[in-house]
Amino acid sequence: MQLNPAEISELIKSRIEGLGVSADIRNQGTVVSVTDGIVRVHGLSDAMQGEMLEFPPTADGTPSFGLALNLERDSVGAVILGEYEHISEGGTVKCTGRILEVPVGPELIGRVVNALGQPIDGKGPINAKMTDVIEKVAPGVIARKSVDQPMQTGLKSIDSMVPVGRGQRELIIGDRQTGKTAVAIDAIINQKGQNMTCVYVAIGQKASSIKNVVRSLEQAGAMDYTIVVAASASESAAMQYVSAYSGCTMGEYFRDRGQDALIVYDDLSKQAVAYRQVSLLLRRPPGREAYPGDVFYLHSRLLERAARVNADYVEAFTKGAVKGKTGSLTALPIIETQAGDVSAFVPTNVISITDGQIFLETSLFNAGIRPAINAGISVSRVGSSAQTNLIKNQSGGIRTDLAQYRELAAFAQFASDLDEATRKQLDRGARVTELLKQTQYSPLPISLMNATLFAVNKGFTDDIDVKKVLPFEHGFHQLLKTSHAALLETMEKNGAKWDVKPAKPDDSAEKQAFKKVCQDAEAELLAAATSFKKSFA
């Protein structure tokens, strides 16, 4: 077959004209090395700090992602989020152009998820309508509102001595096995019916411990308003490091929409250790205790996101959909100390960032005083302004009495002869200590808490044997529940503005009427306590 040269040229022309050239520009690189979940990638010239990188999928087709943390001249250091055994040298890595995001919204409530927001409770997929970035800038000074609403934990010793407000950061610190998690779980359980969404972030704990916490929350009905973010000890250091930020983003969803949320980080010591591990593997220079130089920033940027935001911020964020409402995210970070050393690097960092600390002591815990709160060094820097008047009126001298009692008790064991005033103070302190004991998973409403503190302040427990103080309290509470339900309801309803001071001539009629209600309620409480004391054997 012979082709005409003219036909050949026409054929070539038509082929050239019909050729579709499309250029797909992608920023991709090559894996240089993989070690302990740390991947060094060459060629990602446009990668951002904290950007998600796409790695080759696993054998079953599950996508693999990493987090770009080190941006160097010739390479990028990244941590793999999840399994990394299938990634090998020479593999292709692509930039996604996105910062790490997790699902947020009410769809997550009642679920147990991992650090990436993926369900791990076997209850099926989560159909969240939104995702949000895990790293955010905390609200500025102008967007914030002062803390003036209480966040009741239901624990007598905390709500009376170291009260926590909505939007506060209150550190729970102590050695291992001193009841730190128990305090946080009780606080979550006590939020039932308080319009508070809770987030519990478990970092570096045993899977069995996390399972026990979830079971306790389910039994108390607290999973109806709680999200559990779990990064157990079996997961990679990267997942443990990221989990706290993921949980914070889930809590911020509610804060920014004019709702109240509580987040528990259990615990930040393990997060700091995970971050140290990642940093050392990335060859970052170590500092004090081998932590990297930015370990303070690790926790400060996380805890500063817990805040109470004003109505203008909420209105601007929701574009006018929510008006006149403030939002709050209250944080209860937990730090584990070694042999009570609060001056170690991470504990001092977090103490300086937070608005107070609840210090749990091993010696008190072993002596059966639970929660084992040391009244001397536990403090709340902003919570007193958020404390309800009902509790504030009764708890004024409790903390001082308890701190002085512990000091006196230490000296009294060496003294053979004590004066009457000292002996009275020791007796009173022993009874207050006994009354502040509380079993786990039994938070108290403010009305019953007030009744307990009232009985102490009025001296009803002074001549009762120390071993009978708790039975006295239990019996008194039962009497109030059965015979004085209306009184308890009055205290619950009016507790925030409670006022028993004598009425002034310039008080409005409404204020005078309110004071009369409070005074009558206190008189009824006094009569009930007097009557019960006579019948108590």
From Swiss-Prot:
Cell inner membrane listed as a keyword: yes
Main location: membrane
Entry's localization field: Cell inner membrane
Residues engaged in binding ATP: G174, D175, R176, Q177, T178, G179, K180, T181
Keywords: ATP synthesis, ATP-binding, Cell inner membrane, Cell membrane, CF(1), Hydrogen ion transport, Ion transport, Membrane, Nucleotide-binding, Translocase, Transport
Reactions performed catalytically: ATP + H2O + 4 H(+)(in) = ADP + phosphate + 5 H(+)(out)
Site (Required for activity) residue list: S378
InterPro entries named in the record: ATP_synth_asu-like_sf, ATP_synth_asu_C, ATP_synth_asu_C_sf, ATP_synth_F1_a_nt-bd_dom, ATP_synth_F1_asu, ATPase_a/bsu_AS, ATPase_F1/V1/A1_a/bsu_N, ATPase_F1/V1/A1_a/bsu_N_sf
GO molecular function: ADP binding; ATP binding; proton-transporting ATP synthase activity, rotational mechanism
EC number(s) recorded for this UniProt protein: 7.1.2.2
Family: Belongs to the ATPase alpha/beta chains family.
Role of this protein: Produces ATP from ADP in the presence of a proton gradient across the membrane. The alpha chain is a regulatory subunit.
Protein's name in the database: ATP synthase subunit alpha
Species annotation: Verminephrobacter eiseniae (strain EF01-2)
